[in-house]
């Protein structure tokens, strides 16, 4: 399967314009991107502190260490949960669910109560006392449980006496969309589970009839060590260039994280040779899915000081994921437009010029009006010159975010423009 993926990446690379595919020296950078994507995807699940995340971190650290960066590891404590049973049942209907972190287990007998439907405004179809609440979210590309349309109805249901809440994550794939969470403690007073829209029909019907359902969430959980790292190439200069990317996530994260990781490596390889008048700090964080837990810790301990940093580029989610046809489920050669470029105000004119024609990025936002994810943490820490890309592609936080969701050609063309942005900013 990996070999097939590699052939697909290489075939996609052939579609690059001649100028974009030219090698720097004897290297074909697009082919390097293909290999990097294949390697990243091959690590499997990237949940923070798990085997895939740890192996990925070790690989990335070794890649930039070979370029001359000195690596400093930073331990981060992250939650984990390995399910034994995770299911919702009602009569003859039974469906797998995704336990919402930080997981509150039910015990082996589960939690049983009448199914009561609630909507995004917290309105309930009946009494929630002793109920299993069924939250039917509106259609969206969901990403986090921290937003009000998710957090507030769940909290209200528990306040009204619900024993558990099951959330239908309505979105473009019909599958469970995993939701980021506070990584420090459980967000809610009881068990919360996510249900795929494709599996929700029997339970919505049962809620209309007032039937009882049982939610079972059992498994092994707690906290485990994960690790951020920073690679420094200290040239003894006055100022630093910082480039960061998260690597962790709920599933395989091919489209969500693969493009950012490959672009980060592209920039590290280029900057280690070409950027000679700045010190370099290349930062790679775990714990992203716990509301940027890793990034927050890195900013406290390892990142260069704001006053010493000329420019910080953050490569977040959906750097260059594939577009799809919703009607047919067919992947397209083009890039998903739901990616956003946010820059500090002084960088807006340059960003508009450089990213003209780059789908989704051609209309950059001022960070005064729009920021997200780790960028928000970076700005809050006092960094003055910052650019970040982030977004939500069709399979964002979905189990089948796999090799179909990213191509070397699109990642390479995007990485090249970010290289141009760095060149122009640090020359100014």
Model-derived features with residue positions:
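His/Asp/Glu-rich mid-to-C-terminal helical/loop segments that flank catalytic regions of hydrolases
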Residues: 280, 394-428
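Extracellular/luminal Protease-associated
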Residues: 98-191
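Second-shell loop/turn segments in exported
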Residues: 26, 42-51, 140-148, 152-153, ...
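Soluble metallo-hydrolase cores and metallopeptidase-like ectodomains found primarily
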Residues: 93, 97-125, 181-255, 266-273, ...
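Metal-dependent peptidase/peptidase-like ectodomains
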Residues: 238, 285-387
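N-terminal secretory signal peptides and thylakoid transit peptides that target proteins
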Residues: 1-17
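Noncatalytic luminal/extracellular "stalk/propeptide" segments of secretory-pathway proteins
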Residues: 26-30, 35-132, 139-141
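Catalytic-core environment of secreted peptidases
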Residues: 29-51, 61-68, 124-126, 132-147, ...
């Amino acid at each position: 399967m990996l070999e097939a993926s590699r052939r697909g990446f290489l075939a996609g690379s052939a579609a690059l314009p001649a100028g974009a595919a030219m090698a720097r020296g004897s290297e074909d950078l697009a082919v390097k991107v293909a290999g990097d994507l294949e390697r990243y995807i091959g690590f499997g699940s990237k949940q923070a502190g798990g085997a895939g995340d740890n192996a990925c971190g070790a690989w990335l650290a070794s890649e930039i260490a070979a370029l001359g960066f000195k690596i400093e590891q930073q331990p981060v404590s992250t939650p984990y949960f390995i399910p034994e049973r995770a299911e919702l049942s009602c009569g003859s209907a039974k469906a797998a669910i995704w336990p919402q972190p930080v997981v509150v287990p039910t015990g082996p007998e589960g939690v049983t109560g009448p199914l009561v439907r609630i909507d995004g405004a917290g309105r309930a179809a009946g009494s929630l006392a002793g109920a299993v609440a069924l939250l039917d979210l509106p259609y969206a590309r969901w990403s986090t449980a921290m937003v009000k349309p998710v957090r507030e109805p769940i909290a209200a249901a528990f306040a009204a006496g619900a024993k558990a809440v099951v959330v239908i994550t309505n979105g473009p794939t019909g599958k469970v969309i995993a939701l980021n969470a506070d990584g420090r403690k459980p967000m809610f007073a009881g068990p919360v589970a996510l249900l795929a829209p494709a599996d929700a029909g029997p339970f919505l019907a049962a809620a209309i009839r007032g039937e009882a359902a049982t939610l079972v969430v059992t498994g092994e959980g707690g906290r485990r060590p994960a690790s951020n790292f920073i690679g420094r190439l200290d040239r003894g200069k006055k100022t630093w260039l910082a480039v960061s990317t998260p690597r962790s996530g709920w599933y395989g994260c091919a489209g969500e994280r693969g493009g950012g990781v490959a672009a980060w490596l592209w920039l590290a390889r280029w900057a280690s040779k070409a950027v000679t008048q700045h010190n370099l700090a290349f930062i790679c964080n775990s714990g992203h899915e716990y509301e940027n837990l890793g990034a927050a810790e890195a900013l406290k301990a390892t990142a260069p000081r704001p006053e010493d940093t000329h420019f910080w580029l953050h490569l977040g989610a959906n750097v260059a994921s594939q577009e799809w046809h919703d009607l047919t489920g067919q992947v397209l050669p083009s890039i998903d437009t739901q990616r956003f470029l946010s820059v500090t105000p002084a960088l807006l004119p340059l960003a508009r010029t450089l990213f003209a024609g780059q789908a989704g990025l051609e209309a950059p936002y001022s960070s005064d009006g729009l920021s997200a994810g780790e960028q928000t943490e970076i700005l809050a820490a006092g960094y003055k010159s910052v650019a970040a890309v982030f977004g939500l592609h069709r399979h964002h936080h979905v189990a089948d975010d796999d090799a179909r969701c990213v191509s070397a050609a699109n990642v390479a063309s995007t990485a090249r423009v970010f290289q141009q942005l760095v060149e122009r900013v640090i020359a100014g």
